[in-house]
């Protein structure tokens, strides 16, 4: 579920449209840093073998921000748009059958979408970074397909989505999660699953989520959780963005969202969401309480389009990112085996 490319122009802006059948990789690599302030957050958890837990009060320190703790400029081998584009060209072949069973099951998907409150089939919903349409399949169970838009950067992923019979009425398009090609106040629900980890500037993407929602609309962001175990943290930080729970909350609040809540998710046999992280480890929701654009002001989007990519550097980054990804394919297998051995109720 890769991040969307800039194949479409934002509302009121100027952009280019790819010709049908033509595959054009995105050109940007830009990074920017964000900062957070100390604020309390509300956390609930479901899944991961633990069921519901009591609401906890956490306080995030300034040192937990992405800028202070894990600078956006540090190497992440698949977070860059170009690497992600080619990575998903090959991964799209096996994504639904190899990746999803360990990281994004149907039960997890339905559980994660519950806070989005898809109560009516008439709701207008956008699935940003929807990839092969696995999350969209969960959406169209509750919303009429003609009211749903699926947007992603990868034409290879989107081709897989177009093959799904249940998505025949869905509008499927290429686009950029940080520069959405929709007018302000368009959708009732914004959903994004497994995409934020590829965004060079997560705050900008969440600001866009706020902009395209109507008054009273709900954004539901489903993504990874930063691990606490040193080896998993090493691979996570090298691979792509695994935000801390506090960072999700802070990004939502800065964008203008109210009633921000976070829920941990995970396969029932995966008793280690916080220890090892998980590509789909939490579901964050926020409500838009005012008309119009986000109150947050950001500078121009930074894109490195002038410098050509060194093929050797690109290959190195791609291979290293693939190694990190392989680790996170093996972790669920390891956790499943441990779940069969370690008695239920005991930490693993």
UniProtKB/Swiss-Prot annotation:
It comes from Oryza sativa subsp. japonica (Rice). The lineage of its organism: Eukaryota, Viridiplantae, Streptophyta, Embryophyta, Tracheophyta. One of its GO terms (molecular function) is 2-methyl-6-phytyl-1,4-benzoquinone methyltransferase activity. Keywords: Chloroplast, Membrane, Methyltransferase, Plastid, Plastid inner membrane, S-adenosyl-L-methionine, Transferase, Transit peptide, Transmembrane, Transmembrane helix. Involved in a key methylation step in both tocopherols (vitamin E) and plastoquinone synthesis. Catalyzes the conversion of 2-methyl-6-phytyl-1,4-hydroquinone (MPBQ) to 2,3-dimethyl-6-phytyl-1,4-hydroquinone (DMPQ, a substrate for tocopherol cyclase), and 2-methyl-6-solanyl-1,4-benzoquinone (MSBQ) to plastoquinone. Its main location: plastid. It comes from the Eukaryota. This is 2-methyl-6-phytyl-1,4-hydroquinone methyltransferase 2, chloroplastic. Pathway: Cofactor biosynthesis; tocopherol biosynthesis. One of its GO terms (cellular component) is chloroplast inner membrane. Coiled coil: none annotated.
